[in-house]
Amino acid sequence: MTGRIRQARRRARQFGRIAEACCAGLLRLKGFRIIARDFRVPAGEIDIIARKGRLLAFIEVKARRSAAAEVLTAKQRKRIVRAAEAFMMTRPELAGLDLSFDLMLVGRWRRPRHLAGAWRPDR
């Protein structure tokens, strides 16, 4: 891998971390409590897990320097759902809450957009 590619990937990761932090801050302003960030299991990962009242949201952050409105693939959605299932097994006290799978879109110099209930698990 060339130095230029490595540097571009490093910048993209940094932009993604900043975008996730901005999204977490916006969610707090909207009354959510952040339960976890970067929850990872072999089955998948979730960027942000947040709770507001009886709602537990599993949030995927998509950060792009250009238009961020890229749709999640079915494979990506399945990995997020599997990670959510693994998370729920570790936190049985949250079992009675309503679940939401959300998407937050972040573009350069734009306020993050929160798409609540962006998709439903395929069952």
PLM region descriptions:
Residues 91-123:
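Domain-level recognition of nuclease-like catalytic cores that cleave nucleotide substrates
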Residues 27, 46-68, 80:
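Conserved catalytic cores of phosphodiester-cleaving nucleases, focusing on short active-site segments
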Residues 33, 56, 98:
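Hydrophobic "anchor" residues on beta-strands that sit immediately upstream
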Residues 39, 62, 118:
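Residues forming the ATP-binding cleft of Hanks-type serine/threonine protein kinase domains
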Residues 65-90:
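Mg2+/Mn2+-dependent nuclease catalytic core
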Residues 1-37:
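Acidic-basic catalytic patches of nuclease active cores, encompassing PD-(D/E)XK
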Residues 42-45, 109:
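Short acidic/glycine-enriched loop/turn segments that link adjacent beta-strands
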